């Protein structure tokens, strides 16, 4: 049994919620009507120049997703993209038990051939297109050169905790990994090597992917 005051309070709340939902629908309809108008204009106005990434940091990841999430666009300065990727890999190549985590996303399009993504610990690299072929990256690699002091050591048995998905890789790709990793929905235009010069490696997950030339499992179990 509810007293009259409680019933009135519930009704008031319901009316307020209905108004909020109605307001939200109006905003959605307005946005849908406004979006086509945003695409209008001359061909010259629709062209996108190379962007300085420093103006995009706040917009794309610092405020929305946190400082360790990067969303790149084909219109970004290739040099800055490459420098950012290199800096992340320098931190994460041997960061086996570190606390840092990185998510690197590429918007659909074809990226400059100077951009190479090396994937270290606790790093996810992904394309944001509907299909893997919507996002074309020249090169992506995961090598096994960090374990022990000998640079000729190619043991990938500790290359854990990383992944790549939903993109097209336009050259030969090395993905020398072990457990707790994934490669899925990837188109490799060249050959795919699942080892680093036949060094030890064991595990990994590969699915829904296509290789144009060959997939060399090598020493991979």
PLM region descriptions:
Residues 107, 126-131, 138, 165-170, ...:
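Feature marks extracellular polysaccharide-active and adherence modules
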Residues 70, 74-124, 130-133, 140-142:
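N-terminal extracellular ligand-recognition/capping segment immediately after the signal peptide
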Residues 49-83:
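Right-handed parallel beta-helix/beta-solenoid
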Residues 126, 150-172, 179-188:
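Parallel beta-helix/beta-solenoid
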Residues 1-17:
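Short, Lys/Arg-enriched N-terminal segments with co-localized hydrophobic residues
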Residues 19-27:
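Bacterial N-terminal signal peptides that target proteins for export
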Residues 37-39:
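C-terminal motif of bacterial Sec signal peptides marking the signal peptidase cleavage site
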Residues 52-57, 64-65, 183, 188, ...:
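Predominantly polar beta-repeat domains that present long G/T/S/D/N-rich surfaces used to bind, process
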